[in-house]
């Protein structure tokens, strides 16, 4: 199995937010016993959905749960810049298009209990790949081997991919950054996620200055669970 390494500086950053994401993971667990596959999206690019996905997966892995992090943003992956490998690794695109076996793209990491499937090469038609039987079969197979599967999706305010992915999940989380998206767009994104028929867990407010927030240290996930 190929191995990916997360940079030490990124690990240090994750550890600084450990308390917040441990609480977020606890809230996820309290929301239902059968919530295993969770999509994470945002309204716009740059709001922190990839960082949130990585931190949630890291927190579950640190708690002893066998966790898989899937980079579902095959259009414009941010995660490719976080996990590094000296080996040539295939990813989600190659598996869904039938050019590689999933076992070739399933990667171990330098974090115990955390595994990763990268996005792979850019596809000319990523939406069609996500709508394929291969994607549904992949999720159902991986459910058998992992306690939690976190999928980082493209921004739902930009493309429909996030809604397609969420239909195969158990629940979804919407990430928004302070001052990045207007209320109307956030409400529209929430509605799109709810229309998938899967549980909408709530909104994670990112890039919040907790020094001016009345919730203190809880500011980073103060909006979590508000539906």
Swiss-Prot record:
The lineage of its organism: Bacteria, Bacillati, Bacillota, Bacilli, Lactobacillales. Pathway: Capsule biogenesis; capsule polysaccharide biosynthesis. Belongs to the CpsD/CapB family. This is Tyrosine-protein kinase CpsD. It is an enzyme of class 2 (transferase). Involved in the regulation of capsular polysaccharide biosynthesis. Autophosphorylation of CpsD attenuates its activity and reduces the level of encapsulation. May be part of a complex that directs the coordinated polymerization and export to the cell surface of the capsular polysaccharide. GO terms for biological process: capsule polysaccharide biosynthetic process. Keywords: ATP-binding, Capsule biogenesis/degradation, Exopolysaccharide synthesis, Kinase, Nucleotide-binding, Phosphoprotein, Transferase, Tyrosine-protein kinase. Gene3D superfamilies: P-loop containing nucleotide triphosphate hydrolases. One of its GO terms (cellular component) is plasma membrane. CDD domains: BY-kinase. Its EC number is 2.7.10.2. It catalyses: L-tyrosyl-[protein] + ATP = O-phospho-L-tyrosyl-[protein] + ADP + H(+). Autophosphorylated. One of its GO terms (molecular function) is non-membrane spanning protein tyrosine kinase activity. Dephosphorylated and activated by CpsB.
């Amino acid at each position: 199995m190929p191995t990916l390494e997360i940079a030490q500086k990124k690990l240090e950053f994750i550890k600084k937010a450990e308390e917040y994401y441990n609480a977020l993971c606890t809230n996820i667990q309290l929301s239902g016993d059968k919530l295993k596959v969770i999509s994470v999206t945002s309204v716009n690019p740059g709001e922190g959905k990839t960082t949130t996905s990585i931190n949630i997966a890291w927190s579950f892995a640190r708690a002893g749960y066998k966790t898989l992090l899937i980079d579902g943003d095959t259009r414009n992956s941010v995660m490719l810049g976080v996990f590094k490998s000296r080996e040539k690794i295939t990813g989600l695109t190659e598996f869904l298009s039938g050019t590689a076996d999933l076992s070739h793209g399933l990667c171990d990491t330098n974090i115990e209990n955390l595994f990763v499937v990268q996005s792979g090469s850019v596809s000319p038609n990523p939406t069609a790949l996500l709508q394929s039987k291969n994607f549904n079969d992949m999720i159902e197979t991986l459910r058998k081997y992992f306690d939690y599967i976190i999928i980082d999706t493209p921004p739902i305010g930009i493309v429909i991919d996030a809604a397609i992915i969420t239909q195969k999940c158990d629940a979804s989380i919407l990430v928004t950054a302070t001052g990045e998206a207007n209320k109307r767009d956030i409400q529209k994104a929430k509605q799109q996620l709810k229309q998938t028929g899967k549980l909408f867990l709530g909104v994670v407010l990112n890039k919040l200055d907790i020094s001016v927030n009345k919730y203190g240290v809880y500011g980073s996930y103060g909006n979590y669970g508000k539906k």
